[in-house]
Amino acid sequence: MPKPFYVKFEVPPELADKVYQAISKVRETGGKIKKGTNETTKAVERGQAKLVVIAEDVDPPEIVAHLPLLCDEKKIPYVYVPSKQKLGQAAGIEVSAASVAVIDVGGAKDLIDEIIKSVQQIRAQSG
């Protein structure tokens, strides 16, 4: 199945798994995340987000299509994950999450920094 139009670069499965782990770790170590596209959008617009995670299986895709552009504009790193269901679980909610924003990394700083670095390398290679 082709990726939705808002997916600007390919994220390897092992990196996506690391992202889910990082979101869980942020939540479990006193960090702060915003769940859902409205909350994520506000966090990006206010410049509070350290990392934005966007699910690839959002329907309709227009729900999150503005996030990559907004993140680029605000110079906030973002990454894609394949499953909104898994993203919701990692964020500690019972329902799926189209996107989440990390506001405070808590005890997951190393993991978050590693993810941001990997994303920068992927984006540099994919032009």
Swiss-Prot record:
Under the heading PROSITE patterns, the entry gives: RIBOSOMAL_L7AE
Q: Where in the cell is it found?
A: Cytoplasm
What are the GO MF terms of this UniProt record?
ribonuclease P activity; rRNA binding; structural constituent of ribosome
One GO BP annotation here?
tRNA 5'-leader removal
| Keywords of the record | Cytoplasm, Ribonucleoprotein, Ribosomal protein, RNA-binding, rRNA-binding, tRNA processing
Q: Name one GO cellular component term.
A: cytoplasm
Report which superkingdom the organism of origin falls in. Archaea
Main location (coarse class): cytoplasm
Which InterPro entries does the entry mention? eL8/uL1-like (IPR050257), Ribosomal_eL30-like_sf (IPR029064), Ribosomal_eL8-like_CS (IPR004037), Ribosomal_eL8/eL30/eS12/Gad45 (IPR004038), Ribosomal_eL8/Nhp2 (IPR018492), Ribosomal_eL8_arc (IPR022481)
Q: What HAMAP family does UniProt report for this protein, alphabetically?
A: Ribosomal_eL8
Entries under PANTHER family matching the protein: RIBOSOMAL PROTEIN L7AE FAMILY MEMBER (PTHR23105)
Q: Quaternary structure?
A: Part of the 50S ribosomal subunit. Probably part of the RNase P complex.
- What function does the entry list? Multifunctional RNA-binding protein that recognizes the K-turn motif in ribosomal RNA, the RNA component of RNase P, box H/ACA, box C/D and box C'/D' sRNAs.
The UniProt family comment states:
Belongs to the eukaryotic ribosomal protein eL8 family.
What is the protein's given name? Large ribosomal subunit protein eL8
